[in-house]
Regions:
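Sec-dependent N-terminal signal peptides
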Residues: 4-14
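Secreted/extracellular ectodomain signature
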Residues: 21-131
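Sec/Tat signal peptide C-region and signal peptidase I cleavage site
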Residues: 16-20
């Protein structure tokens, strides 16, 4: 009976050592689930009224890109080229990402600013980066 308990205790100790959690994972900072709003330094725009804004969620590796300009001067081809260039810059800035895939089809929305009365166009792109 003593041999059985000794064998069971040694087996338990051995299994605890084999399946122990690595302490380096515990020392890492937890990933934030908040949305970071990023305004890129290099906007890659040719339209003077255009602005680019990114919303980045580090927990899910998702980025929402918003390209906004006057509706009169909106060109979807330029918006797509700007989005590709800004996403490439974002990928280069974050070394852990090697590519991305589109989560939803890109969309264009038109709206009117109540203060100024201008009509604006917003091009939206929603992507998830892969590690």
């Amino acid at each position: 009976m003593k041999k059985f308990f000794a064998f069971t205790a040694s087996l338990l100790c051995l299994s605890c050592m084999l399946f122990a959690e690595d302490y380096q994972d515990l020392l890492k900072e937890p990933v934030s689930n908040e949305i970071e709003t990023i305004i890129p330094e290099d906007q890659h725009v040719t339209n003077k009224t255009a602005k680019v804004r990114l919303e980045y969620t580090p927990l899910t590796d998702e980025v929402r890109l918003y390209y906004t300009c006057h509706a009169v001067s909106f060109d979807q081809g330029e918006a797509m080229n700007t989005a590709l260039a800004v996403l490439k810059d974002f990928q280069d800035a974050h070394d852990e990402y090697f590519g991305y895939k589109y989560m939803r089809r890109d969309s264009v929305k038109y709206y009117k600013d109540e203060k100024t009365g201008f009509k604006w166009a917003m091009y939206q792109s929603y992507v998830r980066f892969t590690r």
